[in-house]
UniProtKB/Swiss-Prot annotation:
The name this protein goes by in its record: 2-(5''-triphosphoribosyl)-3'-dephosphocoenzyme-A synthase
Enzyme Commission (EC) number: 2.4.2.52
Summary of the function given for this chain in its UniProt record: Catalyzes the formation of 2-(5''-triphosphoribosyl)-3'-dephosphocoenzyme-A, the precursor of the prosthetic group of the holo-acyl carrier protein (gamma chain) of citrate lyase, from ATP and dephospho-CoA.
Protein's gene: citG
Spans through the membrane: none
Record NCBIfam families: citrate_citG, PRK10096.1
Length: 292
């Protein structure tokens, strides 16, 4: 594959360490897509509210992206002496090249564009922290990623142009900042909510898949998911959040019998053409950070 230039500065990171984190990123993507049943999302049971993609597309996509994750880590290390605000500019060509390989692997289907952005940021943050011999925890990784994105929401969402992107339109209409806002804030939905929730359930001995499904419900209940809003408007988003919150209040996903509630939720999401892809991306980050 064609590799964009990154930096002339050398790193002291061992290839084995870089590959270890890249492998975790790949495993995170596979863990999320194979998790079943997920309301409105592609999984092992069905294609959710998507008519243009299947489980195999996500498997091919994750493999293509895995080859680029070491480059994000390496650039994070190579740019460790740069001002954090300057790092994002250098990450963009790597992200675009990674995105190109994703589209080639899926014959043009957008399976993991959001994950390229978020995992790319976290991998670059990991590279920077390792290079600087700084503490590497979920919190420091996310705060470092946030420092790369300082001012991103203002630059890319607040505009008076007549030709608005989907993200700009949702920001102006509903105040949703999407993946950019979550990254710039240091992934608070993950750090303050999803990750501690998931780890607590694991500590209680809950089956890991059930724990992840319950954590997905939590994210769906609290995330202003632009994927949902772009398909169903504010009404669709509020409905999905309310349904997820109701399931959590009833006890969430604690036993295999509770999966029937998710299957019904899935059918309703498909009928409404709603897919919480933004929450799925955050679930990928949750699992990834739980391994650090």
């Amino acid at each position: 594959m064609s590799m964009p230039a990154t930096s002339t500065k050398t790193t002291k990171l061992a290839t084995s360490l870089i590959d270890e984190y890249a492998l975790l990123g790949w495993r995170a993507m596979l863990t999320e897509v194979n998790l079943s049943p997920k309301p409105g999302l592609v999984d092992r049971i069905n294609c959710g509210a998507h008519k243009d993609m299947a489980l195999e597309d996500f498997h091919r996509s994750a493999l293509a992206i895995q080859g680029w994750l070491p480059r994000f880590i390496e650039f994070g290390a190579c740019s460790a002496e740069m001002a954090p605000e300057a790092v994002l500019h250098g990450l963009r060509p790597i992200g675009m090249a990674c995105e190109g390989d994703m589209f080639r692997a899926t014959a043009g289907v957008n399976t993991h564009k959001g994950s390229i952005f978020s995992l790319g940021l976290l991998c670059a943050a990991i590279g920077r922290l390792l290079q600087l011999n700084q503490s590497l925890t979920p919190t420091t990784v996310c705060s470092t990623a946030a420092s790369f994105c300082r001012g991103l929401t203002d630059r890319e969402l607040r505009t008076n142009n007549s030709q608005l992107t989907a993200g700009q339109r949702l920001y102006q209409q509903l105040g949703l900042t999407g993946a950019r806002g979550e990254a710039e804030a240091g992934y608070p939905l993950v750090i303050n909510h999803a990750l501690p929730h998931y780890l607590t359930l694991l500590d209680q001995g809950l089956d890991p898949e059930l724990a992840l499904l319950d954590t997905l419900l939590l994210l769906m209940a609290i995330n202003g998911d632009t994927n949902v809003a772009s398909r169903g408007g504010e009404g669709g988003l509020r409905w999905l959040q309310r349904e997820a919150q109701t399931l959590l209040q009833k006890g969430g996903i604690r036993t295999p019998a509770d999966l029937d509630y998710l299957r019904q939720f899935d059918r309703e999401c498909i009928e409404r053409n709603l897919s919480p892809g933004g929450s799925a991306d955050l679930l990928i980050l949750t699992w990834f950070l739980a391994q650090i």
